[in-house]
């Protein structure tokens, strides 16, 4: 694949290519058995991860890539793995993944960091479509996704993801595995979707409450909740939640309980 290296990564697309198949093989292995799954890859780049996925014989692999310069590389892969590989030239933010793959579905990707959080929030809206995600994030974002209450990283991403899934950090990686080398460390995490949400709650209402409270995370919840309801003190008292807590002190269940009272 040495000829592929002549493609210069585009900064505006957050392109950081992984060249080592040892690394991509390891990432794909974190996804477990994929032989009975449709796999979706976002930002396949030079195809290193693509080859690692196809070597494990998925039911089908569908890649979404925005950079048309990479099309010739993936045309070669399509010819080599006839019927197993589909390449879509598009922006992943514009695609509803339910329209391109048949369940069960796993997503395996080295996500473009500039849109990684936006993609995850988008997928959470129809998360029951997926079995799991094995994703490379900027380490700072990964730490937010897996964070627990009473941690400075705990926030909107933690709550909205963990309401629907178990989350695990698999491995941290330094900048040296990428070309060009980013200025940040990266982490691979597994997000394994639960059969049902942990708690029964109106998701849109929960998301609104979480967003408002964590936008002012240093304020006590009795203050920020007043932007949503006039019954803040009564609600907190009925739920035995001290009104001097900050949002990072509340569990996912407590946020759901509050949402169910509003």
Curated annotation (Swiss-Prot):
PROSITE patterns: RRNA_A_DIMETH (PS01131), SAM_RNA_A_N6_MT (PS51689). Belongs to the class I-like SAM-binding methyltransferase superfamily. rRNA adenine N(6)-methyltransferase family. RsmA subfamily. It catalyses: adenosine(1518)/adenosine(1519) in 16S rRNA + 4 S-adenosyl-L-methionine = N(6)-dimethyladenosine(1518)/N(6)-dimethyladenosine(1519) in 16S rRNA + 4 S-adenosyl-L-homocysteine + 4 H(+). Signal peptide: none annotated. It is found in: Cytoplasm. This is Ribosomal RNA small subunit methyltransferase A. It comes from Ehrlichia ruminantium (strain Welgevonden). Disulfide bonds: none annotated.
